[in-house]
């Protein structure tokens, strides 16, 4: 086994074709991290000119100290049963990490627990410290240890039928409601950033500046690994649909009124059907007024939701999503998710990753909403083997990885107690 000097294109091709490859190991992903102070180095090992393992090493300086952290996000990309390749990757990583004054090498492979026996044993044998099997969104990890994944290598009907029944009905309703899902371009990021700001204010989290999303799009779109989707509501088109539905409802009422006059047996049923139709008419009249007001203000329509869809070979990722507070009954997110899954499948993906979650959290957990949303899309829980540290500077590692988190947790507890008072 020997070190190899390969191009960025060769590195990315290996990552995209390997079962343990991941978006975060693509060379263009490293470019997106520069804004937050990370820089990258890359290593590769192989035999007789054939690549057998690669890794992208991210480095970030420790504040006020002449040291760095070496972080191999979702790496190494290697067959973990191949001890020789794994050992060679670690040797190469140590050499570079020491030159960059790293206090530790941190990895979190894209290897699931049920397939990770070799990885666990071999990494521990090499001296890696395993950080345990904690909850998926534990703050002790950089990347979530658990994500929710939908298999999408199936036809449209099979994909839709893989969703939970209630969610399946919502998707079908969303398809009828009259929104349009667009694959947008860089200009659309302005709209997406505005939607993200609205989402953050509604759900209580800090949002990124537009430059952050431009950075991701610019780095990965050229290779087809980043796409922006937006969902638009056209008022004129939907006013026509509402008018058609109103006409149908009035016709239905007339039909049941006629039956009431000709059949006493059907009178009760007919009255119920008439009442139901009248309720629908009232709702549609309200909707029509809202759409007419929208048409006056925004005759070209408005965008209701958006998302960034990412790729790494046969894996696709729902990375960021945002939505408006208006016209939520049109279920734009449901239309968008189904459309993005189909697009991902048509462009070579077999899986669609919704991102991090805990495993069936309690209803009072802050993470329950995420779990509840992600579990209805025909997903399975992808539980990774977790995070590992290879310590290069024990005193500094002890200070940064163990003492500092304890102090932070203590400050949080004190702050919460003071707030209660």
UniProtKB/Swiss-Prot annotation:
Monomer. The keyword ATP-binding does not apply. The keyword Protein biosynthesis does not apply. It is an enzyme of class 2 (transferase). Belongs to the FemABX family. This is Lipid II:glycine glycyltransferase. Its EC number is 2.3.2.16. The gene is femX. Catalyzes the incorporation of the first glycine of the pentaglycine interpeptide bridge, which is characteristic of the S.aureus peptidoglycan. This glycine is added to the epsilon-amino group of the L-lysine of the membrane-bound lipid II intermediate (GlcNAc-(beta-1,4)-N-acetylmuramic acid(-L-Ala-D-iGln-L-Lys-D-Ala-D-Ala)-pyrophosphoryl-undecaprenol), using glycyl-tRNA(Gly) as donor, in a ribosome-independent mechanism.
């Amino acid at each position: 086994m020997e070190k190899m000097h390969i191009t960025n294109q060769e590195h990315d091709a290996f990552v995209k074709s390997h079962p343990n490859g991941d978006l975060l190991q693509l060379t263009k992903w490293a470019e997106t991290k520069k804004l937050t102070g990370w820089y990258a180095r890359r290593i590769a090992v192989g035999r007789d000119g054939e690549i057998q393992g690669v890794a992208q090493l991210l480095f970030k300086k420790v504040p006020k100290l002449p040291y760095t952290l070496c972080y191999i996000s979702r790496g190494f990309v290697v067959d973990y049963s191949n001890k020789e390749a794994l050992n060679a990757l670690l040797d190469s990583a140590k050499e570079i990490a020491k030159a960059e004054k790293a206090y530790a090498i941190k990895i979190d492979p894209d290897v699931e627990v049920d397939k990770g026996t070799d990885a666990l044993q071999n990494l521990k044998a090499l001296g890696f410290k395993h950080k345990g099997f904690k909850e998926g969104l534990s703050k002790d990890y950089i990347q979530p240890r658990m994500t929710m994944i939908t298999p999408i290598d199936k036809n449209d009907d099979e994909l839709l039928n893989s969703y939970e029944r209630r969610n399946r009905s919502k998707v079908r309703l969303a398809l009828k409601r009259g929104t349009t899902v667009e694959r947008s371009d860089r200009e659309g990021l302005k709209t997406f950033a505005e939607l993200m700001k609205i989402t953050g204010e509604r759900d209580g989290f800090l949002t990124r500046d537009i430059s952050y999303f431009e950075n991701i799009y610019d780095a990965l779109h050229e290779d087809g690994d980043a796409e922006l989707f937006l969902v638009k509501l056209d008022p004129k088109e939907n006013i026509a649909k509402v008018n058609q539905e109103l006409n149908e409802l009035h016709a239905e009422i007339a039909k049941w009124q006629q039956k009431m006059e000709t059949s006493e047996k059907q009178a009760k049923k007919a009255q119920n059907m008439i009442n139901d139709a009248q309720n629908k008419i009232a709702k549609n009249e309200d909707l029509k007024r809202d759409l007419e007001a929208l048409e006056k203000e925004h005759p070209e329509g408005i965008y209701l939701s958006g998302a960034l869809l990412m790729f790494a070979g046969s894996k696709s990722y729902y990375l960021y999503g945002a939505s408006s507070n208006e016209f939520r009954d049109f279920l734009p997110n449901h239309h968008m998710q189904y459309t993005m899954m189909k697009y991902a499948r048509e462009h070579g993906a077999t899986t669609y990753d919704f991102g991090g979650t805990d495993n069936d959290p309690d209803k009072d957990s802050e993470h329950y909403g995420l779990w509840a949303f992600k579990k209805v899309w025909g997903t399975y829980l992808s539980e990774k083997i977790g995070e590992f540290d290879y310590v290069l500077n024990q005193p500094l590692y002890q200070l940064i990885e163990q003492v500092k988190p304890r102090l932070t947790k203590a400050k949080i507890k004190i702050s919460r107690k003071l707030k209660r008072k």
